[in-house]
Amino acid sequence: MKRTYQPSKTRRARTHGFLVRMKTRGGRAVIAARRAKGRARLAV
């Protein structure tokens, strides 16, 4: 059985990237929360 995590930069960015987050209201909330917390990386 192969492992479940098969890294891909493209897929990672397309599902968890900044632009994807900004598309939905919930995603923007995530970015806002991470900004408020002072995260160095807001999204991938």
From Swiss-Prot:
Example GO BP: translation
Record Gene3D superfamilies: 1.10.287.3980
Domain of life: Bacteria
Pfam families in the cross-refs: Ribosomal_L34 (PF00468)
Alphabetized GO MF terms: structural constituent of ribosome
GO-annotated cellular components: ribonucleoprotein complex; ribosome
Coiled-coil spans in chain: none
Disulfide bonds: none
Family matches, as InterPro entries: Ribosomal_bL34 (IPR000271), Ribosomal_bL34_CS (IPR020939)
Entry keywords, A to Z: Ribonucleoprotein, Ribosomal protein
NCBIfam families, per the entry: rpmH_bact (TIGR01030)
Family per record: Belongs to the bacterial ribosomal protein bL34 family.
HAMAP family: Ribosomal_bL34
Record's protein name: Large ribosomal subunit protein bL34
Protein's organism: Methylobacillus flagellatus (strain ATCC 51484 / DSM 6875 / VKM B-1610 / KT)
